[in-house]
């Protein structure tokens, strides 16, 4: 029985990419800088001491990081029994965004430039926003700037509730984000507005429109909910998910995976939010999974709650929680199963600003007949997609080199 379980630790980079200089990210290292802060006692909120990830270390995380950066992260070393194959991967895609990282690891790198809204203020063309407002029957909007999602709620959430005007904002990524209150504005109305925006953005080459619903009564208790939706453009070519589906296999999306791939190549969608719920749902889907199945989970909290918010202790705390539950996954695997843990980009919580960082990502592989040891530097995330194709005996992807024997 052949089953692939992909656990995407969203934003968990392991050191600057070869082209980090082009992004202003030289020195970024999500894993390494978190470990350093923990070792120095600078991440003791809700946890304390050095970063403890014994199960990820056994899968080769520390060793992959050493190969990426030249040194072990603080608290990690050679004194561990390695049970998995480990490597580190550079990104071929032009951007350091979520769709690019996900599509590339599924065999389809993004070799063109996304469109971006580069101006920090007055970010959106008036022609665009006028069309969106006219179609939605709205009198105006708030925001029109680059911002963190939490900060913009503090600044504009009350005015939004008072006026009914949606909040439009963006970031360094190729995104158009819309924040609205679930009750005063309405969740379905927000989704409808996002669909309109997605259609009007067709000529701007923007990767995603993101619905950012929130609840609360004021800045002190405004909170984004788990009802986020991403409206992505479709990948430019069939991914390994599409190929497995076309071959009669099953592809199970847990969390926001389906949205990231614009629902292409997905046969089943499982909604889950929060680290615990996502892990629980992954376990349940692995238990149910039959032959020729991919179970694919994005653990978004690492990125959205801790990376972008530059919360080092929160990121460390969640990594330790994730690590503590890994044995539950390992216990469900058959000899022929293929477990793959990776990331889509970096988001170093010690880095200036609030944007992603251009980093290498871990490639931690277990099962599928792989011997424990180094996979070395992978020149593209697409090596993972090629390996999945090889494992499931699908026709080869155009990009990537497999590290799994078919």
From Swiss-Prot:
GO terms for molecular function: magnesium ion binding; manganese ion binding; phosphopentomutase activity. The keyword Metal-binding applies. CDD domains: PPM (cd16009). Pathway: Carbohydrate degradation; 2-deoxy-D-ribose 1-phosphate degradation; D-glyceraldehyde 3-phosphate and acetaldehyde from 2-deoxy-alpha-D-ribose 1-phosphate: step 1/2. One of its GO terms (cellular component) is cytosol. It is an enzyme of class 5 (isomerase). Binds 2 manganese ions. It catalyses: 2-deoxy-alpha-D-ribose 1-phosphate = 2-deoxy-D-ribose 5-phosphate; alpha-D-ribose 1-phosphate = D-ribose 5-phosphate. Keywords: Cytoplasm, Isomerase, Manganese, Metal-binding. Its cofactor is Mn(2+). Isomerase that catalyzes the conversion of deoxy-ribose 1-phosphate (dRib-1-P) and ribose 1-phosphate (Rib-1-P) to deoxy-ribose 5-phosphate (dRib-5-P) and ribose 5-phosphate (Rib-5-P), respectively. Belongs to the phosphopentomutase family. This is Phosphopentomutase. It comes from Shewanella halifaxensis (strain HAW-EB4). The lineage of its organism: Bacteria, Pseudomonadati, Pseudomonadota, Gammaproteobacteria, Alteromonadales.
């Amino acid at each position: 029985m052949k089953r692939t379980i992909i656990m995407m630790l969203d934003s968990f980079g392991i050191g600057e990419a070869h082209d980090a200089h082009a992004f202003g990210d030289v020195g970024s290292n999500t894993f390494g800088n978190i470990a350093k802060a923990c070792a120095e006692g600078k991440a003791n909120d809700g946890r304390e001491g050095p970063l403890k990830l014994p199960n990820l270390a056994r899968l080769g995380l520390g060793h992959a990081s050493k190969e990426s950066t030249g040194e072990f992260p603080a608290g990690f070393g050679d004194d561990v029994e390695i049970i998995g194959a480990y490597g580190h991967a550079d990104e071929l895609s032009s951007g350091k965004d979520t769709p690019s990282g996900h599509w590339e690891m599924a065999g389809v790198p993004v070799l063109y430039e996304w469109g971006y809204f580069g101006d920090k203020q007055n970010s959106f063309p008036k022609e665009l926003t006028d069309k969106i407002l006219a179609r939605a029957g709205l009198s105006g909007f708030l925001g029109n700037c680059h911002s963190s999602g939490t900060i913009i709620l503090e600044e504009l959430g009350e005015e939004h509730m008072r006026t009914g005007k949606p909040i439009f904002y963006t970031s360094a990524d190729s995104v158009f984000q819309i924040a609205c209150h679930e009750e005063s504005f309405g969740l379905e109305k927000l989704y409808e507005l996002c669909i309109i925006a997605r259609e009007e953005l067709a000529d701007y080459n923007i990767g995603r429109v993101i619905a950012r619903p929130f609840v609360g009564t004021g800045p002190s208790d405004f909170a984004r909910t788990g009802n986020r939706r991403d409206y992505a453009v479709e990948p430019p070519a069939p991914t390994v998910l599409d190929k497995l589906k076309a071959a009669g296999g099953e592809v199970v999306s847990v969390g926001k995976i389906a949205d990231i791939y614009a629902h292409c190549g997905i046969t089943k969608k499982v909604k889950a939010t929060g680290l615990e719920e996502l892990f629980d749902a992954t376990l349940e889907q692995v238990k149910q999974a039959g032959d020729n199945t991919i179970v694919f989970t994005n653990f978004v909290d690492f990125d959205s709650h801790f990376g972008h918010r530059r919360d080092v202790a929160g990121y460390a705390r969640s990594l330790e929680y994730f690590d503590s539950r890994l044995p539950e996954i390992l216990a469900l695997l058959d000899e022929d199963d293929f477990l793959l843990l990776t990331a889509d980009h970096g988001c170093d919580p010690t880095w200036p600003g609030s944007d992603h960082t251009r980093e290498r990502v871990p490639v931690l592989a277990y099962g599928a007949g792989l011997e424990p040891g180094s996979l070395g530097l992978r020149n593209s995330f697409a090596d993972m997609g090629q390996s999945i194709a090889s494992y499931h005996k699908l026709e080869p992807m155009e990009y990537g080199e497999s590290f799994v024997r078919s």
